[in-house]
From Swiss-Prot:
One of two assembly initiator proteins, it binds directly to the 5'-end of the 23S rRNA, where it nucleates assembly of the 50S subunit. One of the proteins that surrounds the polypeptide exit tunnel on the outside of the subunit. Part of the 50S ribosomal subunit. It comes from the Bacteria. Belongs to the universal ribosomal protein uL24 family. One of its GO terms (biological process) is translation. The keyword Endoplasmic reticulum does not apply. One of its GO terms (cellular component) is ribonucleoprotein complex. InterPro entries: KOW (IPR005824), Rib_uL2_dom2 (IPR014722), Ribosomal_uL24 (IPR003256), Ribosomal_uL24_CS (IPR005825), Ribosomal_uL24_KOW (IPR041988), Translation_prot_SH3-like_sf (IPR008991). This is Large ribosomal subunit protein uL24. One of its GO terms (molecular function) is structural constituent of ribosome.
Length: 80
């Protein structure tokens, strides 16, 4: 029995220009920043932005809230 995760061949790769065709960000376009072939997901610039709460550290004792892109499923994007 095999163990591990199977890579999925995706139709997009890093630096491709894509348009979101499904979900809350439908109609938005951007550049692919990162691809996760094992999960079948991609990170698109300016799409699926969420707030991330950062703990206080020595460099930033106040802590912070940053906004960044999170992955979306590759089937929800198409090349433009």
């Amino acid at each position: 029995m095999k163990t591990g995760i199977k890579k999925i061949k995706l139709h997009v790769k890093k630096n491709d220009d894509v348009v979101v065709i499904a979900g809350n960000d439908k109609g938005k376009s951007g550049k692919v920043l990162k691809v996760f072939p094992q999960k079948g997901r991609v990170i698109v610039e300016g799409v699926n932005i969420r707030k991330r709460h950062m703990r206080p550290t020595q460099t930033s004792p106040q802590g912070s809230i940053i906004e960044r892109e999170f992955p979306i499923h590759a089937s929800n994007v198409k090349k433009s």
